[in-house]
Amino acid sequence: MLEFEFLQIAVGNRDKFLCCPSDEEWRRLFYFAQKQSLVGFLFCGIERLPNEQLPKRDLLLKWYGMAESIKKVNVIKNVRCAELDAILRKGNFKGCVLKGQGTALLYPYPEYRQSGDIDMWIGTSDGRLVSIDTVISYAKQRGVQVSHVDIKHADMRFFNDTQVEIHFKPSYSYNFV
């Protein structure tokens, strides 16, 4: 399958495709990249390809533009993670970045990792769990808009340009035996 071959190129396990993709195959690869949130990551594969295997110029430029946008968004999100951590420390909370931004550093090219919001689990500075009421009270004291609260997390508007989910339970089982 061409998609898996492309993933191998992106991670450095291959240098090129066995057969050069057609224009239609490149369009399908681009659609796959968009659908799987791999536009930036697979752009790294494009950068590794020999010139004769590159997609047509219009698709290449579109892909490049989207990859550069992802990099810019990640710069902002990384700054926001540090700012959020500082805000929470002022309230004697200790945070841990989860999921997207938290796992991006495990990628060969973290700047190209597409993620949604910032997910941060918080506890007390001495490692204890915090209640939802404590988290919401602290956020509201800082003028933070709080929406969608459930049993494990709450959406909080710390920043205008970045969505944040604060997790106050590290896990929750929906299945009870």
What are these regions (language model features)?
Residues M1-G116, I122-V177:
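Conserved NTP-donor binding/palm subdomain of two-metal-ion nucleotidyltransferases/polymerases, i.e.
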